[in-house]
Structure formats: structure tokens, C-alpha cells
From Swiss-Prot:
Binding site for substrate: 14, 16, 170, 279
Record-linked InterPro entries: A/AMP_deam_AS, A_deaminase, A_deaminase_dom, Ado/ade_deaminase, Metal_Hydrolase
Gene name for this UniProt entry: add
The family this protein is said to belong to: Belongs to the metallo-dependent hydrolases superfamily. Adenosine and AMP deaminases family. Adenosine deaminase subfamily.
Gene3D superfamilies: Metal-dependent hydrolases
Protein name according to UniProt: Adenosine deaminase
Active site residues per record: 200
The organism's taxonomic lineage, starting at the top: Bacteria, Pseudomonadati, Pseudomonadota, Gammaproteobacteria, Enterobacterales
One Pfam match: A_deaminase
PROSITE patterns in alphabetical order: A_DEAMINASE
Domain of life: Bacteria
Species whose genome carries this gene: Salmonella gallinarum (strain 287/91 / NCTC 13346)
This protein's record includes keyword Metal-binding: yes
Catalysed conversion reaction: adenosine + H2O + H(+) = inosine + NH4(+); 2'-deoxyadenosine + H2O + H(+) = 2'-deoxyinosine + NH4(+)
Cellular component annotations (GO), alphabetically ordered: cytosol
Length: 333
């Protein structure tokens, strides 16, 4: 189902949600951190979703073991590098990796700005080694409150030239976007793009707020947009993209089944919706699974899957020239 003549992208992919189980074992042993299991096979149920979680917050706890072993900046650098290696193995030409530096720093009180620098270094080394093109999106973890998000923002702004966009993720119901207006004002002043997790746990009003108050150019997940036709019309008119993550939305119980997922409706309506993974290691999936298994199960035709692939590059945070160069590079391969 993947069109090999077109660039393959993943623009909603959490770096800190893609820490390999083997790396968790390795770092746990290196830093003498007690883990819930000592073999890869027995660790998997603790760090990977093996059945549907009751809600988004429960799903997010599966990420915790990955960051609990980040006891040094070198460990952060390693997982960033491995994220690019994984992207290359998946056949991705372009990836946007988003990460929450405060979340990654929390367990071992690492300097947040140091985490940002380590991630930048690891991604740069990975791109040079594996030939994947990547951009970084900084996340503010809303779950930890406004002050913690301000610390994350300050650390990200210290390396603003290496960060492409700002995102807001976490407990959407408990921490609405209205709490973070000044944070996003600073991000826009820095020249960053804006994407926001919205319409995943909360309703269409959360998406409207992300667009009107935070300046979102893209929406992460955005499944509840299907409940508001005027909103879908607005997304089309303003070319605001939806970063769809099919398997993730089932595992978080955001959507009951793939057959119920609104991605097909979005594409039929002309919304610039794309296919993405979200947290590949935690979910036990890759981008190939999303195209070959999840998308057909969600009712997408071959042409709709191809359109979602086209949309992935269309709404990527790249200049028109960079998009054209990537298309030409893939076409010539």
C-alpha cells in the first residue's frame, strides 16, 4: 500500500515513546535501576501495550519505564540516535520527532536544557549515519502544569535554531490549551511552527481552541473533528493538517475500532490528514503496519492511502523547496 515513488513520512512520532525494550534493559543494568522484569520477553508487557488501555492517561503510563532509565545525557543521546536508526529501518525518508525534555529529565533530575542538547546531538548523528531527514518538535507536557511547561519552553528556546515546532501533549481534559496562551505566544515569536494534541480526549472545542488561541497549523490526532462539520470545512479551507494515528487511537480507547476511525471521512472531506505511528515501541507497531494493516482495516481505499502519504509531506514543517527536493530525491532513487 506504500507508494515507493513518493516520500514516506512520519510526522507524529514521539521520540520518548519509541525507546526500545532492549535499550530499557541495557540502561537499567548500566545504571542499576530496578526493572519489573529482567528478560526482553518478560519486560514487554510492562513497556508495550498488549491490549487496549481504558483511556489516554493509562496508555501514557506505558511510556514511563522508557524514561525512568534515562539516568544520563548520554542515555538521552543514545535513544535519540536509535530513533533515527529505527526510522531508517522502517524505510522513512522524513521524520518529525517530538519529545518532552522535562519528562525525559524528570526521573533523574537531569538538566532540561542538557536533555534538549543531547537529543539534538543524537538525532544529528543518526541522520548523518543513516541518511534520514529529520526535524525536531519540542513538547510541553501539559500534565505537569504551567510552570513545568515554562521550564521546558525555556530549555527548548535555548536551542531554538534546532527546533522546528512546539507541541502540547498529555492530559487534554485536565489541562486545556487556555492555560498555555503565553507559552505559545513566545513560540510563535521565535518563528516556530505550532502543532497541538487536540480532539483526542476532549471534543471539537479543544481543536477550535488550539487553532484560534494557540495558533495551531496542524492538529495531533484530532479525531473529534468529525463531530463538527463546520470545523472540518475550516480545516480544509485553512489547510490545517490532521496527524492521524490509527493504532494509537484504538489502544487509548479514543476510538472503539478501526472501522469507526474518522480518517476515511477526513480524506473524503478533503482534510489534509496523514498516516503516522505516535509511540511505535510502546504500541508494538511501525509505519509499515499503519499503511498495510491499519489503514485498510479503517476502510481506506488504495487511492486514499496514497493521498494520506502525499498529505504527510504536504503538511510537513518543511519549505516548498525542501519538499520538492525530497520528492525529486525519492523519484530518482
Amino acid at each position: 500500500m506504500i507508494d515507493i515513488t513518493l516520500p514516506l513520512t512520519d510526522i507524529h512520532r514521539h521520540l520518548d515513546g519509541n525507546i526500545r525494550a532492549q535499550t530499557i534493559l541495557d540502561l537499567g543494568r548500566q545504571f542499576n535501576i530496578a526493572l519489573p522484569a529482567q528478560t526482553l520477553e518478560t519486560l514487554i508487557p510492562h513497556v508495550q501495550v498488549t491490549s487496549t488501555e481504558p483511556d489516554l492517561v493509562s496508555f501514557l503510563t506505558k511510556l514511563d519505564w522508557g524514561v525512568k532509565v534515562l539516568a544520563s545525557l548520554d542515555a538521552c543521546r543514545r535513544v535519540a540516535f536509535e530513533n533515527i536508526e529505527d526510522a531508517a529501518r522502517n524505510g522513512l525518508h522524513y521524520v518529525e520527532l517530538r519529545f518532552s525534555p522535562g519528562y525525559m529529565a524528570m526521573a533523574h533530575q537531569l538538566p532540561i536544557a542538557g536533555v534538549v542538547e543531547a537529543v539534538i546531538d543524537g538525532v544529528r548523528d543518526g541522520c548523518n549515519t543513516f541518511g534520514v531527514e529529520a526535524r525536531l518538535i519540542g513538547i510541553m507536557s501539559r500534565t505537569f502544569g504551567e510552570a513545568a511547561c515554562l521550564q521546558e519552553l525555556d530549555a527548548l528556546l535555548a536551542h531554538r535554531e534546532n527546533i522546528t515546532a512546539l507541541d502540547l501533549a498529555g492530559d487534554e481534559l485536565g489541562f486545556p490549551g487556555s492555560l498555555f496562551l503565553s507559552h505559545f505566544n513566545r513560540a510563535r515569536d521565535a518563528g516556530w511552527h505550532i502543532t497541538v494534541h487536540a480532539g483526542e480526549a476532549a471534543g471539537p472545542e479543544s481543536i477550535w481552541q488550539a487553532i484560534r488561541e494557540l495558533g495551531a497549523e496542524r492538529i495531533g490526532h484530532g479525531v473529534k473533528a468529525v463531530e463538527d462539520r463546520a470545523l472540518m470545512d475550516f480545516l480544509v479551507q485553512q489547510r490545517i493538517g490532521i496527524e492521524s494515528c490509527l493504532t494509537s487511537n484504538i489502544q487509548t480507547s479514543t476510538i472503539a475500532s478501526l472501522a469507526d476511525h474518522p480518517l476515511k471521512t477526513f480524506l473524503e472531506h478533503g482534510v489534509l490528514a496523514s498516516l503516522n505511528t505516535d509511540d511505535p515501541a510502546v504500541q508494538g507497531v511501525d509505519i509499515i503496519h499503519e499503511y498495510h494493516v491499519a489503514a485498510p482495516a479503517a476502510g481506506l481505499s488504495r487511492e486514499q492511502i496514497r493521498q494520506a502519504q502525499i498529505n504527510g509531506l504536504e503538511i510537513a514543517f518543511l519549505s516548498d523547496g525542501e519538499k520538492r527536493a525530497l520528492r525529486e530525491k525519492v523519484a530518482a532513487a
